[in-house]
């Protein structure tokens, strides 16, 4: 298969993966309206082309939370990444390090903190959920700190899980799910050998290390569902802010007032995110929510964005809408599933090339120069229209 864009990696991943895994990463909540709008709203953001600007010198590097990034991109937290390629979190982390950007390990990763952190030279980031089991949260924070994790990404938009109807049809959940997954694995022998056999163990490494016994895929949904905490409030995060001395980023912000609360709380950054359309269907896409949030808190903390980013052009669009950097999710998992570490490295190379073209043709020499001026007037008016 010819790979020229992230969309090609999606097709390659679909061909290689058992359906339950492909649809788990590809799908969203309920009717998936927000999932689709994340992509379409971002694609509708029109860039402002400029010419004759002497664009011989482009600088894509940026500073974020005391780190130098080769470009304003990080690999975001994705649960079960280790099911998409053999020890997938390690491969993805190595790809990110090779391209000079951060990797964020999910709470519900297959590979534990202690396996991923030593595999790369640059410090990684760690994502943590708000869970009823505060003992697990403290244990995970202590282990992350001991492993040299620099930045904590705290996900707050899952006090309860959104319903993902596609999972019941694909075999991730629903009747006879274990049997259906086994039959799917048999019909996908390349994945079954590379991941199913050589990629063991298949437990949730960070959770198993705390519980003292394997927490496998069959326990994944049940354990998480029992531990999400709908009672969480800002005051419940204060002990974490006191314990974690490094940068702390609040992930799951879609409203300007919540962004202001994050500033008052003392967060170092936020991620404008609807969880990739996997939580509450019908909310604003990240691209539509971002401008008003940037107007409210720009300069008071770092603003990251995710959901719907599929190309280097999308990265530039998000920066022009007000983000300081972006997180990649589905896009890098598709590439990982298709071709492991090499696939992720190639995806990041494609994104960098696309960013260079977009910056050259919008007349922006550096990341700091990418602003609303890089957007067409029509796009700026549309962005203002959704501001509260």
From Swiss-Prot:
<feature type="binding site">
    <location>
        <position position="127"/>
    </location>
    <ligand>
        <name>FMN</name>
    </ligand>
</feature>
<feature type="binding site">
    <location>
        <begin position="306"/>
        <end position="330"/>
    </location>
    <ligand>
        <name>FMN</name>
    </ligand>
</feature>
<keyword id="KW-0997">Cell inner membrane</keyword>
<feature type="binding site">
    <location>
        <position position="155"/>
    </location>
    <ligand>
        <name>FMN</name>
    </ligand>
</feature>
<dbReference type="InterPro" id="IPR013785">
    <property type="entry name" value="Aldolase_TIM"/>
</dbReference>
<feature type="binding site">
    <location>
        <position position="164"/>
    </location>
    <ligand>
        <name>substrate</name>
    </ligand>
</feature>
<dbReference type="GO" id="GO:0010181">
    <property type="term" value="F:FMN binding"/>
</dbReference>
<dbReference type="InterPro" id="IPR000262">
    <property type="entry name" value="FMN-dep_DH"/>
</dbReference>
<feature type="domain" description="FMN hydroxy acid dehydrogenase">
    <location>
        <begin position="1"/>
        <end position="380"/>
    </location>
</feature>
<feature type="binding site">
    <location>
        <position position="24"/>
    </location>
    <ligand>
        <name>substrate</name>
    </ligand>
</feature>
<dbReference type="InterPro" id="IPR037396">
    <property type="entry name" value="FMN_HAD"/>
</dbReference>
<dbReference type="Pfam" id="PF01070">
    <property type="entry name" value="FMN_dh"/>
</dbReference>
<keyword id="KW-0560">Oxidoreductase</keyword>
<protein>
    <recommendedName>
        <fullName>L-lactate dehydrogenase</fullName>
        <ecNumber>1.1.-.-</ecNumber>
    </recommendedName>
</protein>
<feature type="binding site">
    <location>
        <position position="278"/>
    </location>
    <ligand>
        <name>substrate</name>
    </ligand>
</feature>
<dbReference type="GO" id="GO:0004459">
    <property type="term" value="F:L-lactate dehydrogenase activity"/>
</dbReference>
<dbReference type="GO" id="GO:0006089">
    <property type="term" value="P:lactate metabolic process"/>
</dbReference>
<dbReference type="InterPro" id="IPR020920">
    <property type="entry name" value="LldD"/>
</dbReference>
<comment type="similarity">
    <text>Belongs to the FMN-dependent alpha-hydroxy acid dehydrogenase family.</text>
</comment>
<dbReference type="GO" id="GO:0009060">
    <property type="term" value="P:aerobic respiration"/>
</dbReference>
<dbReference type="InterPro" id="IPR012133">
    <property type="entry name" value="Alpha-hydoxy_acid_DH_FMN"/>
</dbReference>
<keyword id="KW-0472">Membrane</keyword>
<keyword id="KW-0288">FMN</keyword>
<dbReference type="InterPro" id="IPR008259">
    <property type="entry name" value="FMN_hydac_DH_AS"/>
</dbReference>
<dbReference type="GO" id="GO:0005886">
    <property type="term" value="C:plasma membrane"/>
</dbReference>
<feature type="binding site">
    <location>
        <position position="251"/>
    </location>
    <ligand>
        <name>FMN</name>
    </ligand>
</feature>
<feature type="active site" description="Proton acceptor">
    <location>
        <position position="275"/>
    </location>
</feature>
<feature type="binding site">
    <location>
        <position position="106"/>
    </location>
    <ligand>
        <name>FMN</name>
    </ligand>
</feature>
<comment type="function">
    <text>Catalyzes the conversion of L-lactate to pyruvate. Is coupled to the respiratory chain.</text>
</comment>
<feature type="binding site">
    <location>
        <position position="129"/>
    </location>
    <ligand>
        <name>substrate</name>
    </ligand>
</feature>
<keyword id="KW-1003">Cell membrane</keyword>
<keyword id="KW-0285">Flavoprotein</keyword>
């Amino acid at each position: 298969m010819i790979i020229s864009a992230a969309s090609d990696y999606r097709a390659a991943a679909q061909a290689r993966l058992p359906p339950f895994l492909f649809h788990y990463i590809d799908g969203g909540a309920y009717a998936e309206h927000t999932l689709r709008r994340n992509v379409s709203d971002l694609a509708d953001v029109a860039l402002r082309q400029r010419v004759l600007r002497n664009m011989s010198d482009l600088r894509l590097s940026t500073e974020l939370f005391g780190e130098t990034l080769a470009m304003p991109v990080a690999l975001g937290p994705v649960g079960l990444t280790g099911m998409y390629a053999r020890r997938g979190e390690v491969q993805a982390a190595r790809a990110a390090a090779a391209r000079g950007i951060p990797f964020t390990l999910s709470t519900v990763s297959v590979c534990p903190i202690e396996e991923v952190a030593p595999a790369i030279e640059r410090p990684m980031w760690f994502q943590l959920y708000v869970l009823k089991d505060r003992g697990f949260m403290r244990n995970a924070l202590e282990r992350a700190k001991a492993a040299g994790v620099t930045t904590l990404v705290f996900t707050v938009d899952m006090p309860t899980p959104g319903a993902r109807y596609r999972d019941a049809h694909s075999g991730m959940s629903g009747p006879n799910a274990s049997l259906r997954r086994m039959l799917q694995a048999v019909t996908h022998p390349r994945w079954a050998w590379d991941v199913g056999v050589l990629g063991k163990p298949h437990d949730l490494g960070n959770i198993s290390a705390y519980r003292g016994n394997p927490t496998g895929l069959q326990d994944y949904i049940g354990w998480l569902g029992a531990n999400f905490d709908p009672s969480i409030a800002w005051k419940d995060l204060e002990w974490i802010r006191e314990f974690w001395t490094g940068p702390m980023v609040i992930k799951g912000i879609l409203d300007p007032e919540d962004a202001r609360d994050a500033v008052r709380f003392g967060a170092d950054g936020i991620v404008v995110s609807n969880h990739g359309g996997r939580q509450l269907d019908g909310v604003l896409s990240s691209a539509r929510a971002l401008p008003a949030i940037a107007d409210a808190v720009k300069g008071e903390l770092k603003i990251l964005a995710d959901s719907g980013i599929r190309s280097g052009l999308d990265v530039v669009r998000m920066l022009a809408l007000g983000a300081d950097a972006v997180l990649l999710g589905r896009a890098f998992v598709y590439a990982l599933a298709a071709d492991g570490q090499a696939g992720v490295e190639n995806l990041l190379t494609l994104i960098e090339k696309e960013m260079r073209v977009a910056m050259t043709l919008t007349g922006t020499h550096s990341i700091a120069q990418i602003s609303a001026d890089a957007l067409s007037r029509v796009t700026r008016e549309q962005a203002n229209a959704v501001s509260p």
